[in-house]
């Protein structure tokens, strides 16, 4: 882990907190270029936009591609508060991201070892992966969110 990982993961956590405030599953992501500049950010928006594809990673990748004018993000690092799901892991492969740093593990849908490891397959792009960065903090925001969600009446799951 490089010393900047914690700094950037804190930024991703801020995006997760913004998602939680809008009733979204609190996952945040940022993409950083080789010089350490934040290129883009994303947070879950599936509920708000009624779109299953709008995960934090996908939004951050889309914004980075638009900002950089390229679909290859080969000099970039993605920071995300939770282990990517299969859809997001596929987008990471396709966008050629150089490195992925994630916070907590996803025992239900994690694609980097928690459920299966997409990275073990002979795909056309390999990249560095580091998990468990600020794991407790990243897991806590999710636990708190779902504990609060379970307290709400059944019909009001997406209301704040």
Question: Where are each of the predicted segments found?
Answer:
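Short, basic and Ser/Thr-rich N-terminal targeting/leader segments
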Residues: 23-27, 74
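Short beta-strand scaffold segments in enzyme catalytic cores
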Residues: 27-36
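Zinc-dependent deaminase
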Residues: 1-22, 84-160
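Conserved hydrophobic/aromatic pocket- or pore-lining residues that grip, position, or stack substrates
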Residues: 12, 28, 60
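A short acidic/small-residue loop/turn micro-motif
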Residues: 45-48
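Helix-adjacent hinge/juxtasegments
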Residues: 50-54, 58-95
């Amino acid at each position: 882990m490089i010393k900047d990982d914690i700094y950037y993961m804190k930024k991703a956590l801020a995006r997760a907190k913004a998602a939680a405030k809008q009733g979204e599953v609190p996952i945040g992501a940022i993409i950083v270029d080789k010089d350490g500049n934040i290129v883009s950010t994303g947070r879950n928006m599936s509920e708000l936009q009624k779109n299953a594809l709008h995960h934090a990673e996908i939004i951050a990748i889309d914004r980075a591609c638009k900002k950089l004018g390229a679909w290859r993000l080969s000099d970039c690092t993605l920071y995300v508060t939770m282990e990517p799901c299969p859809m997001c892991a596929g987008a990471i492969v396709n966008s050629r991201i150089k490195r992925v740093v994630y916070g907590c593990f996803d025992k239900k849908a994690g694609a980097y070892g928690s459920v299966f490891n997409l990275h073990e397959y002979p795909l056309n792009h390999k990249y560095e992966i580091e998990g468990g960065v600020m794991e407790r903090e990243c897991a806590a925001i999710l636990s708190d969110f779902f504990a609060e969600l379970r307290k709400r009446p059944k019909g009001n799951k997406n209301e704040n």
